[in-house]
Swiss-Prot record:
Membrane topology term: Multi-pass membrane protein
Taxonomic superkingdom: Archaea
Coiled-coil stretches noted in the UniProt entry, renumbered to this chain: none
Entry GO terms, CC: plasma membrane
Subcellular location(s) of the protein: Cell membrane
Species classification: Archaea, Methanobacteriati, Methanobacteriota, Thermococci, Thermococcales
Main location group: membrane
Entry protein name: UPF0056 membrane protein PYRAB13050
Family according to the record: Belongs to the UPF0056 (MarC) family.
Keyword set, alphabetical order: Cell membrane, Membrane, Transmembrane, Transmembrane helix
Ranges that cross the membrane: 8-28, 49-69, 73-93, 111-131, 140-160, 181-201
Pfam families associated with the record: MarC (PF01914)
Annotated source species: Pyrococcus abyssi (strain GE5 / Orsay)
Length: 201
């Protein structure tokens, strides 16, 4: 049981760093700041459900994607590690997402899906990670991790106002840098594991 909890904690911290919902708070609040609290919570719920469904879908069909494209898990780990390393370096610089939203032609429901849920939170890095998790870890633990991330996304976005009040943009940048450090170390390890597997080292 202790080993299961340890694995869950490691996977959760890694996926939380990649999705970085705290870093998405300023953009989320910029879109919903004019809404009543209950409406903000509705949008946060739509974002979290979309994140959950997206990550679960790719986690469950990932092995067929590998087969279809004739890609090995090790090759995918190397490519994914490079992608995550780049993301981690951007986060280490304290860069907040530069996703732009044109509010004139879209509804809040559409914004909740694109770009807030995809690709801001459940982007290529998160999708790559859950697919690799499923090949290397116990599927029930991976699924539990994804569900926990979905719940975390909702709680953080629904509390966006309080988070900005407590942390401010500087605090959010510091948090983003911390997540970037975790992500960069994960990426390097992913690349090392991929190289070892590919060359039988």
């Amino acid at each position: 049981m202790l080993e299961v909890l340890k694995t869950f904690a490691v996977l959760y911290v890694g996926l939380f760093a990649i999705t970085n919902p705290v870093g998405a708070v300023p953009i989320f609040m910029g879109v919903v700041s004019h809404l009543a609290p209950d409406k903000r919570h509705e949008v946060a719920e739509k974002v979290s459900i979309t994140v959950l469904v997206t990550l679960l879908t790719f986690a469950l069909v990932g092995k067929w994607i590998f087969k279809f494209f004739g890609s090995s898990v090790d090759a995918f780990a190397i490519a994914g590690g490079i992608l995550l390393f780049r993301m981690g370096m951007e986060m280490l610089s304290g860069k907040l997402s530069s996703v732009k939203i044109d509010e004139e032609d879209v509804t809040l429901e559409e914004v909740a899906v694109i770009p807030l849920a995809i690709p801001l939170i459940s982007g290529p890095g998160a999708i790559t990670t859950v697919m690799l998790y499923m090949t290397r870890e116990s599927p029930p633990i991976v699924i539990a991790t994804i569900i926990a991330i979905g719940i975390s996304v909702y709680i953080i976005l629904a509390s966006g106002n309080k988070i900005i009040e407590k942390l401010g943009r500087v605090g959010i940048k510091v948090t983003t840098r911390m997540m970037g450090l975790i992500l960069t170390s994960m990426a390097i390890q992913m690349i090392i594991n991929g190289i070892k597997g590919a060359f039988g080292i």
